[in-house]
Design a protein with these regions (language model features):
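Gly/Pro-enriched, hydrophobic low-complexity segments
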Residues: 87-89, 112, 119-120, 206-279
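Short helix-loop boundary/capping segments
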Residues: 173-226, 240-241
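Sec-dependent N-terminal signal peptides of Gram-positive bacterial secreted proteins and lipoproteins
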Residues: 4-26
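Hydrophobic lipid-interacting interfaces of membrane-associated proteins
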Residues: 64-77, 108-114, 137, 141-146, ...
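Acidic/charged, solvent-exposed loop-and-adjacent secondary-structure segments enriched in E/D, K/R, S/T
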Residues: 142-191
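N-terminal leader/targeting segments and the immediate start of mature chains
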Residues: 19-104, 262-280
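N-terminal beta-strand/beta-hairpin edge segment
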Residues: 85-141, 146
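Short, hydrophobic/aromatic-rich segments at coil-to-beta transitions
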Residues: 57-66, 100-106, 205-214, 233-236
């Protein structure tokens, strides 16, 4: 009996120490547990940067939701008749239950309100269903059963539907990318999976062949973004959203990656289960 009490006491002490270490470091994301092994955030970003710099587009598993932005020639498009231009076609079907890549990007997005720099109007919450084609900074949309409409301002209002689209072209600047992330609610792309967050601080640093920056907000929320420059026809914008909404388990966190990349067209499917990281 005495030995049993000593054993239980030892287990209780170890559990208490483990909880303390988990709670203290869960406040700032410093390490991730992927596939049972720990990897630092810097090493994680470096690995992603290395994969993307070498045009490795096979990095897809049950951990990630993935959206691809494809660079296609005019001959492959029936929407663009000008042979002097190329266009970026977003393709994919984003849902929480599945991710199937198709010829057009059909989607359902809940967008949070933000201020339009074009007309100063405040855009409220809306739900958008349709498809989008971006042509050298100009946007062609098909909403519901309407025809394609051309818009070069980046913001379109039609039938109480609002969206924000930004193209990654040769003229894209890192400041444009930063503004895109700051102004657009990335979490809304998950169609209500997580709440809307407001990011308060931003850190910026270089990674191989591109940039990376981090947006941090309240409630232990962090958005890590990598932007790979690559060649003129291969540009990648990757977003890693780390959240911790659990009040009873500070050592648990959910990470979701939404990747927009230039790539060749192909059909891919991804599992539906969300990635869970344990943090120290």
């Amino acid at each position: 009996m005495k030995r049993r009490i000593m054993y239980l006491s030892f287990i209780a002490i170890l559990s208490f120490c483990f909880l303390l270490s988990g709670c203290n470091s869960a406040i700032s994301i410093s390490a991730l547990h992927i596939g049972g092994s720990e990897i630092s955030k810097d090493a994680f970003l470096a690995e992603i940067a290395e994969r993307e710099a070498y045009n490795d587009r096979q990095f897809i598993s049950e951990q990630w939701y993935r959206v691809k932005m494809q660079t296609l020639s005019d001959k492959e498009s029936s929407d663009n008749k000008n042979s002097d231009n190329s266009y970026l076609s977003i393709s994919g079907n984003v849902m929480l239950s599945s991710l199937q890549f198709r010829s057009k990007f059909r989607f359902s997005v809940n967008s949070e309100s933000f201020n339009s720099q074009d007309d100063g109007a405040e855009i409220t919450k809306n739900k958008l269903s349709g498809q989008v084609t971006c042509v050298d900074g100009e946007i062609y949309t098909k909403l519901k059963d309407t025809d394609y409409q051309k818009n070069s301002g980046g913001i379109k209002k039609s039938d109480n539907v609002t969206y924000f689209c930004d193209t990654l072209t040769d003229n894209s600047d890192i400041n444009d990318i930063i503004e895109l992330i700051k102004n657009f609610d990335v979490a809304a792309l998950l169609d209500g999976y997580i709440d809307s967050y407001r990011f308060e601080t931003m850190s910026f640093f270089r990674v191989p062949d591109g940039y990376a920056f981090s947006l941090s907000g309240a409630d232990k929320v962090q958005l890590v973004v990598t932007y790979m420059e690559g060649s003129s026809r291969v540009k990648t914008l990757s977003l890693y959203l780390f959240t911790d909404k659990s009040s009873d388990s500070l050592a648990s966190s959910t990470s979701t990656k939404l990747e927009i990349s230039a790539s060749t067209s192909r059909r891919i499917s991804a599992p539906s289960n969300k990635d869970k990281y344990k943090m120290r």
